[in-house]
Amino acid sequence: MAKEKFERNKPHCNVGTIGHVDHGKTTLTAAITKVMADVYGGSAVDFANIDKAPEERERGITISTAHVEYETDARHYAHVDCPGHADYVKNMITGAAQMDGAILVVNAADGPMPQTREHILLSRQVGVPALVVYLNKVDQVDDEELLELVELEVRELLSEYDFDGDNIPIVKGSALAALEGRDDNIGKESIVELMKAVDEHIPQPERPVDQDFLMPIEDVFSISGRGTVVTGRVETGVVNVGDEVEIVGIKDTTKTTVTGVEMFRKLLDRGEAGDNIGALIRGVGREDVERGQVLAKPGSVTPHTEFSAEVYVLSKDEGGRHTPFFANYRPQFYFRTTDVTGEVILPEGTEMVMPGDNVTINVKLIAPIAMDEGLRFAIREGGRTVGSGVVSKITV
């Protein structure tokens, strides 16, 4: 059967369900696909298909994730749901499934639980821009005051991690009722209300081409009589012939002008996000540029050596280390296109980090790298990946 053509007539947004085990994330995911399919067309995905999510390998890490899609009046959504807590941790840290926003599911009868807190913290650390809350299983709570108490508790928890706890929409309902097509007031209607809140509260992500120009440099060539050409895939933004750009990272930042852009040996006026290009740069010698630096819009990105990060350390089964690491561990940190050695400083009270753990660390690199909060990296030893991380805060 031929694949359906993807109709891009609505803006696209990536979301996911997060929250404590058994609070109803997968049931809610199934309920959203059902209700949205009834209202806007599309196909419902049943619970069993989401629950037995296939295992994927992303950067050597085994992650189970289920992907579903649906649409509302305003947008087309791709939605991820993970069966296990470990899958969430890995998914969020590696960025395997990008989230422009998340739906936090909290069981009204239990209130926030340890993983509720951990998923909110992870969302903060990895830069999920906005959350919306679904207070699930409200039919199991008879006492209105108890519901209000749980809502208050959730808001306080969100505020504690710098989300806008006072104003985040909290929708109350029962995902199971919606899925089973009963009690519409807490079932179907709550799902419609939830998706309206998601439409309004989760900002439309900026498309990569609308962001500032950045291209990680993969290779450098010298073309006699023409000068130096750097090649790479444009990550964000657009570069036009004649634009002034900066070369950032590893060495001192230098300014240059792009005098030519080519793709597949054809000359272009511009290169944009997603294009693999060669950029001819003026007045820069072959030995002045190297793989691992980036070409960027002047002033848009700065080089740093010290940062804190949220990392996941691969388990032995995933091909990671067999033994823990301790303070002063010095692996390579692989950013975009290159490895830089760095020293790991562990948080107070943490003696060691075991394979399979996730932990917040501080890192001191021996050379500066162009970085922003939210940048992903791999941790490597002798060319093999032993961990994955995301920059949560730049310190120097």
Curated annotation (Swiss-Prot):
Keywords per UniProt: Cytoplasm, Elongation factor, GTP-binding, Hydrolase, Magnesium, Metal-binding, Nucleotide-binding, Protein biosynthesis
Region feature G2, mapped onto this chain: 60-64
Coiled coil region boundaries: none
Region annotation (G5) ranges: 174-176
Record bears the keyword Nucleus: no
G3: annotated span: 81-84
Ranges for region G4: 136-139
EC numbers on record: 3.6.5.3
InterPro entries: EF-Tu_GTP-bd, EF-Tu_GTPase, EFTu-like_2, EFTU_2, G_TR_CS, P-loop_NTPase, Small_GTP-bd, T_Tr_GTP-bd_dom
Gene Ontology cellular component terms for the protein in this record: cytosol
Subcellular location: Cytoplasm
Domain of life of the organism encoding this protein: Bacteria
Known role: GTP hydrolase that promotes the GTP-dependent binding of aminoacyl-tRNA to the A-site of ribosomes during protein biosynthesis.
NCBIfam families found in the cross-reference section: EF-Tu, PRK00049.1, PRK12735.1, PRK12736.1, small_GTP
Protein name in the entry: Elongation factor Tu
Source species of the chain: Erythrobacter litoralis (strain HTCC2594)
